[in-house]
C-alpha cells in the first residue's frame, strides 16, 4: 500500500493525514496526536485506524470482544506508521509484533478525553482539594479497560510524551493530548500496571528537555535513580478511628504537646560488624523500635524531618522534588501509611516537616519544567534562593498555589498526618530575605512583603481547618512578623503555633556561659516572658542547633563532665517548666556528644553510662509531669498561667515562678544556674502547708548529687516575693526544682 497523500492528483485525507502532519508526528512535534492516530470515522459507518509504532514489525487489528482478527494495518513509506480501513467501526485491540515478541493491547488513541471539566477548572483556579487523585499517574478503568491515566501540567510545551520501560523510553510512542486552556496533557495507557517507572519527555518552546519526573508522582524510584513510579491506590485498613475522633481534643491549645523530632534515616539503622551503617530501616522496622521508645519517654508526638522524596540525602529532605511521594528509602506509600496507623494506635501523633518555600534545581525536577519558568519565578531576583541554591515557588500563580495546597491536604487526608511544620516561613514572607539592596523586586505596593506567599499561607491554614479538622499547621518563622498564630479573620496568618526562635537563641546563649558570668546575662532567660503570649509558641531545640559546628546540646554546656550533665538536666527542666509547647531533637534526650550526622545512627552505646541514662530518665519524667499536671500546659498561651516570684536575683543566678492551671492549681519552679548549692533560700508561696517535690533535676535518679530537701518543704508564715507565706529551700547546684502543694 502506498502512503502518498495524492493519487492521480486526488487527495485522500481520510486514509492519511497531510505530509506536514505526518512529518510532525515522525519528528515527535505534533501537538495533537489524537487528530492523526487511533480510530477515525470514514463517514459511511466504517473507520480508518492509524498507529505510530516505531520499531514494530507488523500490526494486526482484533475484535476487542471476540479476539478475532479483523485485518492488518499496512506499513508504508513512513517507518513506524501503520494504517488500515475497516468497513465497520467497532472496539478493537492491536496485536503488535516486535523484534522481541508479541504485544496485545487496546489502542491508547481510541479513548476520549479523560479529565473532567470541573477538575480542570478547579486546578486552574488553584483550589482543587484532591489533586493527587486527579493529576499524575492514576490506576483507573476506562470503558472496562484497566490501565493508567497520566496527566501533567505543561502549558508551554509543544509536545509531551510518557516514557518508560514499557515503551523503551521512546517519546514517539506515547505522545499526550493537550486539554485547552488548562495546559494539562493527558493519556490513558491500557494494561499498564502499578510499579512501572516513568517520566515525561517534553518538547519545550526552545527544544527537547531533559526527561522530567512527575511533579504529582505518588511513588518514586529509590535515589539516586530519579524516575517516578505508578503507585497502587492506598488501601490500608486504618485502625486509628479512636485517635482521629479524639484528635481535635488531644491537639487543643490547652492540651500538652511534647514533640520528639527525628530523621527517619539516622535515628537507628542496621549496622555491620564494624559498627558502620549497613542499611536504613524500613517504616515497619522503625515502627517496631521507635514507637515503644517514644511512648516510654512520654512524648505526645513525633515530628519527622521531610520524608517527601528528595534526590540529595544531604539536604535532610529539605530540598524535595516529589511533594506527594514518601521517599522510597524507607518503603512504599502503603508502608508509610501503616507506620502512621501504628503510631496512632499507640497514642502518638505524627507531624511532618513540609517545604513550600523552595525546591532544588535538578534537571529532572520542576526547574524550567516545560521549557519556561513554570513553578518558579522567571526573574532570578524573585525566583533564586541564594542561601540554598534553590528555586522559589511562584505562589502567585494559581496552579502553583493549588499544587502546594494539594500537597498539604494529600498528607493530612490520605495519610492521616496530624500536622505540618512549615519550613522556612520567614524566607517566604519577605522578598528581600537574605538579599542585599538591588537584589530583590518589591511587591506591587513597593514593599518588601511577599503578598503572594502571605495569601497562600492564609489560604492554606483556612483550608486545612475545613478539610482536616484538628490538624496542626506550625510555622518555623524567625522574625518578628506579627500575628503568625492569630486567626486569619483577625489579620493573622492562621498558624496553630510558631517556633519560638528568640527563646531558643537567648536560652542557649545563656546556658553556654560559664556560671561565673551568668549574672551578666541574667535577662537572657527571663526576656522570653516579655513576649511569651504574643503568639502561641513551641520551644524548639531542633536539628538546626546540633549541626554545622554548633556542637551537640550537651557539648554546648560549660564546665567539667559533671557540670555539663548538670547544666543539661537543668536546661531541659527549665524548658519543660517554661510556658510553651516542647520540641526536642533526637539524641538530645540522652546527651549525645557528637553533632548529628545524617549518615550515622545515634550513639546508642552511650546509654551504658549512668549519666546518659539519667538524662534520658529525666526527659521521660519531665514529659510525664508535663502531661499529668495542668499548670504545666493548660494556660501556656495566656499570662494567667505564669507568675514571676524571683526574676531579678542575678547575683545568685536564681529564678523562681509559679505555673497556674485554669482551676487555680499552682506549681512552684525554682532554678539555680550556678554550681553553688544555696542552703536556706527563701521563696514566697501562695498556699500553706506541705509542698512535695515533684522533680529535682539533681536527683540521684538522674545521676545527680542528690542534694535537696528530702522530697518536701513546709510553708512558714513569713511573707516573701509578694506572697504571704514562704518556703525555705535548699537549692541544688545547677538544678531545677518543681514543687506542688498538698492542699
Swiss-Prot record:
A Gene Ontology term for the protein's cellular component: cytosol
Protein keywords: Carbohydrate metabolism, Glycogen biosynthesis, Glycogen metabolism, Glycosyltransferase, Transferase
GO-annotated biological processes: glycogen biosynthetic process
Functional pathway: Glycan biosynthesis; glycogen biosynthesis
Molecular-function GO terms, alphabetical: 1,4-alpha-glucan branching enzyme activity; cation binding; hydrolase activity, hydrolyzing O-glycosyl compounds
Catalytic reaction annotation: Transfers a segment of a (1->4)-alpha-D-glucan chain to a primary hydroxy group in a similar glucan chain
Catalytic residues identified in the record: 423 (nucleophile), 476 (proton donor)
Enzyme kind, highest EC tier: transferase
Keyword Glycoprotein listed: no
A Pfam entry, by short name: Alpha-amylase_C
The enzyme's E.C. designation: 2.4.1.18
UniProt xrefs under SMART domains: Aamy (SM00642)
InterPro entries for the chain: A-amylase/branching_C, Branching_enzy, GlgB, GlgB_N, GlgB_N_E_set_prok, Glyco_hydro_13_cat_dom, Glyco_hydro_13_N, Glyco_hydro_b
UniProt similarity note: Belongs to the glycosyl hydrolase 13 family. GlgB subfamily.
Function: Catalyzes the formation of the alpha-1,6-glucosidic linkages in glycogen by scission of a 1,4-alpha-linked oligosaccharide from growing alpha-1,4-glucan chains and the subsequent attachment of the oligosaccharide to the alpha-1,6 position.
Record text on subunit structure and interactions: Monomer.
Protein name, UniProt field: 1,4-alpha-glucan branching enzyme GlgB
Amino acid at each position: 500500500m502506498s502512503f502518498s497523500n495524492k493519487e492521480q492528483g486526488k487527495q485522500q485525507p481520510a486514509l492519511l493525514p497531510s505530509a506536514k502532519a505526518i512529518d510532525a508526528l515522525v519528528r515527535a512535534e505534533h501537538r495533537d496526536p489524537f487528530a492523526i492516530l487511533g480510530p477515525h470515522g470514514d463517514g459511511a459507518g466504517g473507520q480508518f485506524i492509524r498507529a505510530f509504532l516505531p520499531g514494530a514489525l507488523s500490526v494486526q487489528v482484533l475484535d476487542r470482544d471476540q479476539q478475532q482478527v479483523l485485518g492488518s494495518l499496512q506499513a508504508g513509506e513512513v517507518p513506524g506508521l501503520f494504517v488500515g480501513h475497516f468497513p465497520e467501526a467497532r472496539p478493537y485491540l492491536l496485536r503488535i509484533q516486535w523484534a522481541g515478541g508479541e504485544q496485545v493491547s487496546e489502542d491508547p488513541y481510541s479513548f476520549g478525553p479523560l479529565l473532567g471539566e470541573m477538575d480542570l477548572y478547579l486546578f486552574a483556579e488553584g483550589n482543587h482539594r484532591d489533586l493527587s487523585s486527579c493529576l499524575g499517574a492514576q490506576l483507573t478503568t476506562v470503558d472496562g479497560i484497566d490501565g493508567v491515566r497520566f496527566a501533567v501540567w505543561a502549558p508551554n510545551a509543544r509536545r509531551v510524551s510518557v516514557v518508560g520501560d514499557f515503551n523503551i523510553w521512546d517519546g514517539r510512542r506515547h505522545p499526550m493530548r493537550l486539554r485547552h486552556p488548562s495546559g494539562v496533557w493527558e493519556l490513558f495507557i491500557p494494561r499498564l500496571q502499578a510499579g512501572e517507572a516513568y517520566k515525561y519527555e517534553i518538547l519545550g518552546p526552545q527544544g527537547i528537555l531533559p526527561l522530567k519526573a512527575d511533579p504529582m508522582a505518588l511513588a518514586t524510584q529509590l535515589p539516586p535513580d530519579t524516575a517516578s513510579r505508578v503507585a497502587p491506590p492506598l488501601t490500608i485498613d486504618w485502625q486509628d478511628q479512636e485517635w482521629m475522633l479524639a484528635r481535635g481534643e488531644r491537639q487543643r491549645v490547652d492540651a500538652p504537646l511534647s514533640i520528639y523530632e527525628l530523621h527517619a534515616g539516622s535515628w537507628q539503622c542496621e549496622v555491620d560488624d564494624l559498627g558502620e551503617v549497613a542499611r536504613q530501616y524500613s517504616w515497619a522496622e522503625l515502627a517496631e523500635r521507635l514507637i515503644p521508645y517514644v511512648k516510654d519517654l512520654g512524648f505526645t508526638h513525633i515530628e519527622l524531618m521531610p520524608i517527601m522524596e528528595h534526590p540529595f540525602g544531604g539536604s535532610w529532605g529539605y530540598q524535595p522534588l516529589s511533594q506527594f511521594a514518601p521517599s522510597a528509602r524507607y518503603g512504599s506509600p502503603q508502608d508509610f501509611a501503616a507506620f502512621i496507623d501504628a503510631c496512632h494506635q499507640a497514642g502518638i501523633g505524627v507531624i511532618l516537616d513540609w517545604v513550600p518555600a523552595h525546591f532544588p534545581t535538578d534537571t529532572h525536577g520542576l526547574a524550567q519544567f516545560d521549557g519556561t519558568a513554570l513553578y518558579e519565578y522567571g526573574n532570578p531576583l524573585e525566583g533564586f534562593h541564594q542561601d540554598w541554591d534553590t528555586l522559589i515557588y511562584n505562589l502567585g500563580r494559581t496552579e502553583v498555589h493549588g499544587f502546594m495546597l494539594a500537597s498539604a491536604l494529600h498528607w493530612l487526608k490520605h495519610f492521616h498526618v496530624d500536622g505540618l511544620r512549615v519550613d522556612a516561613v520567614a524566607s517566604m514572607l519577605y522578598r528581600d530575605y537574605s538579599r542585599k539592596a538591588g537584589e530583590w523586586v518589591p511587591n506591587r505596593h513597593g514593599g518588601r512583603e511577599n503578598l503572594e506567599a502571605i495569601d497562600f499561607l492564609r489560604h492554606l491554614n483556612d483550608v486545612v481547618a475545613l478539610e482536616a479538622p484538628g490538624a496542626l499547621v506550625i510555622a518555623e518563622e524567625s522574625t518578628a512578623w506579627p500575628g503568625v498564630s492569630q486567626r486569619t479573620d483577625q489579620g493573622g496568618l492562621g498558624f496553630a503555633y510558631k517556633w519560638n526562635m528568640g527563646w531558643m537563641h537567648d536560652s542557649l546563649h545563656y546556658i553556654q556561659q560559664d556560671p561565673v558570668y551568668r549574672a551578666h546575662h541574667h535577662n537572657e532567660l527571663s526576656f522570653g516572658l516579655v513576649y511569651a503570649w504574643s503568639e502561641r509558641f513551641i520551644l524548639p531545640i531542633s536539628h538546626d542547633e546540633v549541626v554545622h559546628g554548633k556542637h551537640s546540646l550537651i557539648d554546648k554546656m560549660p564546665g567539667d563532665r559533671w557540670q555539663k550533665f548538670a547544666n543539661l538536666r537543668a536546661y531541659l527542666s527549665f524548658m519543660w517548666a517554661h510556658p510553651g509547647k516542647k520540641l526536642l531533637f533526637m539524641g538530645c534526650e540522652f546527651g549525645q556528644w557528637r553533632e548529628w550526622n545524617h549518615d550515622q545512627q545515634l550513639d546508642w552505646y552511650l546509654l551504658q553510662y549512668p549519666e546518659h541514662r539519667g538524662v534520658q530518665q529525666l526527659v521521660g519524667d519531665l514529659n510525664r509531669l508535663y502531661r499529668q499536671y495542668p499548670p504545666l500546659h493548660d494556660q501556656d498561651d495566656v499570662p494567667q498561667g505564669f507568675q514571676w516570684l524571683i526574676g531579678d536575683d542575678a547575683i545568685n543566678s536564681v529564678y523562681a515562678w509559679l505555673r497556674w492551671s485554669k482551676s487555680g492549681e499552682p506549681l512552684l519552679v525554682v532554678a539555680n544556674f550556678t554550681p553553688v548549692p544555696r542552703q536556706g533560700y527563701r521563696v514566697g508561696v501562695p498556699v500553706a502547708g506541705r509542698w512535695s517535690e515533684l522533680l529535682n533535676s539533681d536527683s540521684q535518679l538522674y545521676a545527680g548529687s542528690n542534694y535537696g530537701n528530702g522530697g518536701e518543704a513546709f510553708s512558714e508564715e513569713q511573707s516573701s516575693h509578694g506572697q504571704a507565706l514562704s518556703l525555705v529551700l535548699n537549692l541544688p547546684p545547677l538544678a531545677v526544682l518543681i514543687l506542688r502543694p498538698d492542699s
